[in-house]
């Protein structure tokens, strides 16, 4: 299951002393680079944590559309081929495993701690609208005592977590951006994280599935599957671990997100029900 981190203990991130508040840019940014679905997180940039679940909404900029000709079996991941790369099921590692993990990602990661309480500002950085290809270069994190904004790799160097779980890719989806190009560009960003803090364990999370009805016609579940298949190979090539969480978020009969797992208003952002399933999966893999 989880890379040796579960058997070893280490002083936790001394983040509260190092970090006043993680401030993420893009106060009202688009989840998807090619249009639609604005998602404004309530209280973004404020100095107090807001736990208002009424903020769990998205303003849809266009009508919901359905994918055409999606074959859920077309890009199935060969779990036997990648058995040394895909994290296997294991005993529940508990909240301590989550607490010593730094979560990096886009707005679905931001929702983990800004809308829900699965992690906190101490161990998550979610930047709305951020893509995997910008991981190495996009400065979006501010620390007390440091001027300007830091990139996520620079933040990892300052925070020194036991491991990082990265969830990017939704904002990279585009018919003109191949899975191989995405994986290659994303890998450069992950290597920047490794270079910034070499002792960190790298776990790449699957891109979450879309709802069968979603707000951006440029997004397809076919491409989500293609990207995830490329991510497993990328992880194997680089000695990283792959968290195949899509398997618990997907409806096995359709290949799309399970009913109730994405917001009905956009078919993209994960609901609390989905987050609950996701974090159970994280603790047990």
For each of these PLM feature ranges, what is it?
Residues 23-38:
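Hydrophobic membrane-insertion alpha-helices, especially the h-region
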Residues 91, 95-184:
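Conserved SGNH/GDSL esterase-like catalytic core that processes O-acyl groups on lipids
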Residues 179-189, 224-227:
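Charged helix-capping and loop-helix junction motifs
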